[in-house]
Structure formats: C-alpha cells, structure tokens
Amino acid sequence: MDWNRVEGNWKQFKGNVKEKWGKLTDDDLDVIEGRRDQLEGKLQERYGYAKDQVRKDVDDWFTTLK
C-alpha cells in the first residue's frame, strides 16, 4: 500500500489516527486531509516530537495498515 490510499480514503483512517494520537483535534484532522506532511507537522506541534521521531512513528503506524 502507498500513502495515496490513506490520502484518498482519509475519512476511513481518521478514527485510527485519532485513536493512535489522541491529542490531535477534529480540526487538526480536517486540516491534515490525509497529507503525510500535514500529519507529521501536527504531530510535532501537539506532541513536541522531533522530525525524525515523527517520521518513525508515522512509518510504524502506516505499516500496521498493510
């Protein structure tokens, strides 16, 4: 699976993202709209993660979707 599937079906993945990263608000999820760069940016903002940590966390989450 590639990220385009997440972006194209964002409404289906929003609940999973909210469950994994509960500090993200519904407004955050609407802004993200399935875009990986937006997701990573919001995670950095809400959790104070470094860019490398965010990328690893998103990669780990993404692999669970396959």
From Swiss-Prot:
Pfam families: CsbD (PF05532)
InterPro entries: CsbD (IPR008462), UPF0337_stress_rsp (IPR050423), YjbJ (IPR026042), YjbJ_sf (IPR036629)
Source superkingdom: Bacteria
Signal peptide: none
UniProt similarity note: Belongs to the UPF0337 (CsbD) family.
PANTHER family from the UniProt entry: UPF0337 PROTEIN YJBJ
Entry protein name: UPF0337 protein RPA4217
Organism of origin: Rhodopseudomonas palustris (strain ATCC BAA-98 / CGA009)
